[in-house]
Amino acid sequence: MRLRRNYKGASQLNHQAKLFRSIKTIVDFDDVMVHQAKDYFHDYVKKGIILTLDFEAYKWQTTNEYANISFLFNINRFQYKRVYEPLFGIEYETFVDYLKSFIVLSMDQHVLISLQSFLRDIKRLVKETKQNILEDVYNIKITSPTLCIDFFSSLPCYETLIMNQFLEQLDNLITIQYELKPRQQRQLAQFQSYFAFNDILKDYWEQQLPDEERLFYYPLYLWWQITAVVPLRPREFLLTQRDCLFEKNDKYYLTLRRNNLKGKEKGVSHKIAEDYYLTTYEIPEKLALTIQHYLDLTKGLASTKLDTLFVTETHYKRWERRTGINNRFLTYTNLNTILKYFFNEVVSERYGYQVYYLNPPNRLKDNEINFIHIGDTRHIAMINLIAEGSSPVTAMLLAGHDNVTTSSHYFSNLSQFIECRSYQVYRKLTSSQTTYEISKTQRKYTIGKAYV
């Protein structure tokens, strides 16, 4: 399979990506976005897809020509004001407008049934959250955590610690749902996507890129290089300290923060010094130089309040915005935004791939790829560890699990991973134009805890 760059964009996808780009290129919901959504709403009315004439209506009727699908916006007002309004800082009526806007602006990417299920997820989340939003989310039936993440991460609310932990809990649900499905849950198509994403990112990174563009995508590149090898949780990666790299005896070492909390309680974090410990890993020189290059490029920029590896100025500069006064660290929301931009601007437009965000096929064609989620690399790293010969106990320790049984869920798809990798090696042997690889694990690492 030839790895193709299409810098003019993929014409066959342009009509599909129009609305999706519009929702992504606006960092947060605002009045302009709602107005745009209302324009699209009326366009869908003219096309006969939305049968309700009024955007403000309590209930929308839509049709896909096979069946009528209704959207009932009866969000529990009392529960929203009690739990979610203090968290989001968004009034009830405005929240409903944002929810309607998100659905309209997502209609070119998702079928109506999927969006109806998403709306029901939001209603269940609001209605069934009792006391602790971070714990309750695990007990609430969520069918479309991916869409929930996209929606909540677009809300113009202050990025509190609880908000980011809430998004991570939803990300965890994606992995949990994979494990609850039959054994074929991660089919070859998903592993094909990992290999294809690796190829695209590698090829893109080797291009001559403007510093501003490279800096915007730098966190994504290091996320893939590090967390696809070391099974980190997203927040562990994002809280990597600025002074994380050192050299000793001609070898390079990277210090990472690991969560000291276990099970469902891991989402309840109050003080980094108490909830995280430092662990050091030996890393290849190439990765060390890549991290050092980022440190050099951002040397003169304002550090975050938590003095993390990643600064935020280069992120918000993309939209000509200044970093807020509460510049704690580059958040899960920020990284998720970068990932979505990469899939839209690079994977789809530059390389001409068709991206499946939901309901992917069992096997992909050469120009197709599934969307990858932030939490996926933890799964990849666990499989990679076992595939490279590490013991289940080692995988358990590196993942921060209490027992091997928990870890085994992550590498239960090893056979499919090996099958896919064998398939890609075969493709490599039969065509020298493309190589597939997932970075090999480093054999040397330190498990010892050094509390911060």
Segments and roles (model prediction):
Residues 1-185, 225:
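Charge-rich, intrinsically disordered N-terminal extensions
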